[in-house]
Design a protein with these regions (language model features):
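N-terminal signal-anchor transmembrane segment
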Residues: 2-65, 135, 351-355, 366-373
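Transmembrane alpha-helical segments and their membrane-water interfaces
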Residues: 86-129, 330-334, 340
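Alpha-helical transmembrane segments of multi-pass inner-membrane proteins
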Residues: 122-140, 163-207, 213-220
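Membrane-interfacial helix-loop-helix modules of multi-pass inner-membrane proteins that assemble, modify
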Residues: 130-165, 263-264, 303-306
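A membrane-periplasm/extracellular boundary helix in multi-pass inner-membrane enzymes
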Residues: 223-265
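Long extracytoplasmic/lumenal interhelical loops at the membrane interface
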Residues: 265-322
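Hydrophobic transmembrane alpha-helices and their immediate junctions
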Residues: 321-353, 381, 388
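Transmembrane alpha-helices of multi-pass inner-membrane enzymes
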Residues: 352-353, 364-401
């Protein structure tokens, strides 16, 4: 009789857990769909529907938090509440709600399996990106005049109906990275060839240099991770890389006109440093966010040699747009999480940090997942390895060559 009652209790308890987890998973489907459609040129969503998706996601994350946390108020609840208030303030200031969505996604992570979250995100992206890719193939053969492209430095760059070439490449790159993360222990040379063939087509169309560099570097890190020096480098860079890169780019931004190498580096990064330096000269750094008219045409500046303002370097963007406070929080999180991350996790964190040099998407945990892993590792601490990745799996990840 006792065994029967215990079984009934466990069944109901597990059913409740699954229902609570489904709230988060549904939120992931909503936000990933919203983010991709916000870039789409073939599926236009109205501002009203966009706001509805935003509010639905926020509601689901709050519901998940209410279902997970104890109703007794603790210090951690107050900290989370203040964190949300801070991100709401920043989001209103900069007119961009990604920082709020990331904060809510992190707070609601308690008890979640991060691998399952990435898997859900992966399948949603597969659906939408496949739709756009085949729509592009159909259009390019049947209605070639309807396909728009960007002409940059005499290069024709297609965007596959996704806003702009770099954004398109980013979405496909992190889709492939999600596949690699989920199938890390099964990666092989044949899988490398297949993924490279597909991504090669994307790169041929978009001409995104950043994406191909990060893609190649990630595979090199995976292949060479048996070497002790590479392991140590990955561990060090995943822990301190954000601090080092933030300090470096802040220094270059402030002293752009006084450094002999700044213009050479700016040319290599296709104008990203000059844009940040120009923004700093007119707006300065910000603690909790400031509004910038990114993309706005300005009068030609002969000193910085820019005629529009773009912030595509993640580190500069944090200081100039989102706020120094968030850069500090990310740096602390990466440092603290290092003790809980597996070697596999650290490899993908390194890829994110390198990607952030040329692109500004890394703070969005639903497009670039490494910060989601970091947050989960901190949140669940030792349970992270026990529940999501057992020790044997972690060792397999280290031995893959």
């Amino acid at each position: 009789m006792t065994d029967s009652r215990e079984y009934t209790y466990l069944y109901r308890h597990n059913k409740k857990i699954n229902q609570v987890e489904m709230i988060y998973y549904f939120g992931v489907i909503i936000i990933v769909t919203k983010l991709i459609l916000s870039y789409s040129e073939i599926i236009s969503i109205s501002p009203l529907f966009n706001n509805l998706l935003n509010l639905t996601f926020v509601f689901l994350m709050f519901l998940k938090v209410l279902c997970t946390f104890n109703l007794r108020i603790k210090k951690v609840h107050i900290i989370f509440a203040l964190f949300v208030i801070m991100t709401v303030y920043t989001s209103i200031q900069i007119d961009n709600y990604i920082i709020l969505f990331t904060a809510l996604g992190i707070i609601a992570l308690k008890g979640m399996n991060v691998k399952s979250i990435i898997r859900i995100s992966y399948y949603v992206k597969i659906f939408w990106l496949t739709l756009h890719f085949f729509a592009f193939i159909f259009a390019i053969f049947c209605f070639p005049n309807s396909v728009q492209y960007s002409l940059i430095d005499n290069e024709v760059r297609y965007r596959i109906f996704l806003s702009q070439p770099n954004t398109c490449a980013m979405l496909f790159l992190w889709l492939i990275f999600e596949y690699m993360y989920l199938n890390y222990e099964k990666l092989s040379f044949s899988k490398f060839l297949i993924s490279s063939l597909f991504f090669g087509v994307i790169i041929y169309l978009t001409k995104s240099k950043t994406s191909i560099i990060v893609y190649v570097l990630l595979w090199l890190l995976i292949w060479q991770n048996k070497r002790k020096c590479i392991k140590k480098l990955i561990g060090f860079f995943s822990k301190y890389g954000y601090i080092i890169l933030s300090a470096f780019f802040a220094f270059v931004t402030v002293n752009y006109n006084n450094l002999s190498f700044s213009r050479i580096l700016n040319t290599f990064l296709t104008g990203r440093l000059a844009g940040a330096a120009k923004t700093y000269s007119t707006n300065g750094f910000t603690l909790l966010g400031q509004y910038l008219e990114l993309g706005k045409k300005i009068e030609w500046d002969p000193i910085y040699r820019v005629n529009s303002i773009w912030l595509e370097n993640s580190y500069s963007m944090m200081f100039l747009n989102f706020g120094i406070v968030y850069a500090i929080l990310i740096a602390i999180a990466l440092w603290y999480a290092s003790d809980y991350l597996t070697h596999k996790d650290k490899i993908f964190v390194c890829a994110m940090l390198i990607y952030g040099i040329s692109e500004s998407y890394i703070v969005n945990i639903f497009l670039c997942f490494p910060l989601l892993i970091v947050a989960s590792a901190i949140y669940n601490k030792r349970e992270y390895l026990k529940k999501n990745y057992n020790i044997d799996e972690a060792r397999k990840g280290e031995c893959y060559g």
